[in-house]
Amino acid sequence: MQELGKVESNSIRVTRQDDKRITIEKDLDTEHMVLSMGPQHPSTHGVLRLECITDGEVIVEAEPYLGYLHRCFEKHCENVDYPGIVPYTDRMDYLAGMNSELAYCLTVEKLLDIEIPRRVEFIRVITSELNRIASHLVAIGTYAIDLGAFTPFLFCFRDREHIMNLLEWISGARMLYNYIWIGGLAYDVPADFKKRVAEFVTYFRPKAVELYKLLTENEIFVKRTKGIGIMPADVAINFAWSGPMLRGSGVKWDLRRNDPYSVYPELDFEVPVPDGKFSDVGDCLSRHLVRALEMEESLKIIEQCLDKMPEEQGFDPRALIPKKIRPKAGEVYGRAENPRGELGYYIVSDGKSTKPVRCKARSSCFVNLAAMKDLSKGQLLPDLVAIIGSIDIVLGEVDR
């Protein structure tokens, strides 16, 4: 690495590399300090504890401690029938319940080998993309407030409220929806669904541009995030990263494009990745940038779905839902692109029971958080807040 700055004295040599990591060589025999960050800390986005070993203000190692929000999700699934698991999935990533429900239902439908009505497919994608935008607004708003910018937080939650009202109008709930069911939906959308969703798209498009100018192009925000927590593409792949974290490292991988499901093969949209002109590829700013740009792509997807969604009088989205779900014996893995990455479910059926023998959830947040040691080593302690915020973790999904 190229050395950007070097300070020497008789007893200490401090070097800052081009990725802003700091190395300290010294002749003094000093002890490292151990700092416990969390489990109740404003920047941890939930009950996460980090044990940080520091050399002065430089992080030597940051070890995450998990499990404070463990609720036995996978064990509960063994004692609940297949449809009864849907509400539990809402409570994993509670900021993206529609996406969590979709991933689970796709997996069971794959095991049952059933076909879903086209109208249902389009409604599922529209509600999931609305939820994706709402989730990214939380990620961006809370990231801003982590770094001391309060106004963008208010802008994000102002616009998110429009989506929450829409989803409540469609499903009856603001966060824990229980709307996407195996084989269909809980019920059809209201009569003026297309009109209200189209109005939101028209409203939000200039607001997304406004937010980009307010925060992403803000000089102070750029200084706090550019070059911090760099993760090279090959290392990100080895850690099995996915979602905005992987795309922030320059890898163009999105399950909606690379392993498409539902009606995504029929839709035209881009997969944003940083080009290195505005940010250093793989840094905190790149990960934020991907989320900011993805919101516009979600708007494009919603518009196309509104145009293509078939109108059906007297449509019953529950008509194809079997009253008793008893899949054939076998196992299946299904996955979908959640706002934080690949959310997958591995389900085992014995062919006799209406309950799964095993239901394993693959959490993107858990996998992304596993790289915390590599991301934080050599960084300054104040930059740890920027690194945690850039991961966009939801501890309900991490701990399950």
From Swiss-Prot:
One of its GO terms (cellular component) is plasma membrane. It catalyses: a quinone + NADH + 5 H(+)(in) = a quinol + NAD(+) + 4 H(+)(out). Its EC number is 7.1.1.-. GO terms for molecular function: NAD binding; NADH:ubiquinone reductase (non-electrogenic) activity; quinone binding. Pfam families: Complex1_49kDa. Belongs to the complex I 49 kDa subunit family. NDH-1 shuttles electrons from NADH, via FMN and iron-sulfur (Fe-S) centers, to quinones in the respiratory chain. The immediate electron acceptor for the enzyme in this species is believed to be a menaquinone. Couples the redox reaction to proton translocation (for every two electrons transferred, four hydrogen ions are translocated across the cytoplasmic membrane), and thus conserves the redox energy in a proton gradient. This is NADH-quinone oxidoreductase subunit D. It comes from Chlorobaculum parvum (strain DSM 263 / NCIMB 8327) (Chlorobium vibrioforme subsp. thiosulfatophilum). The gene is nuoD.
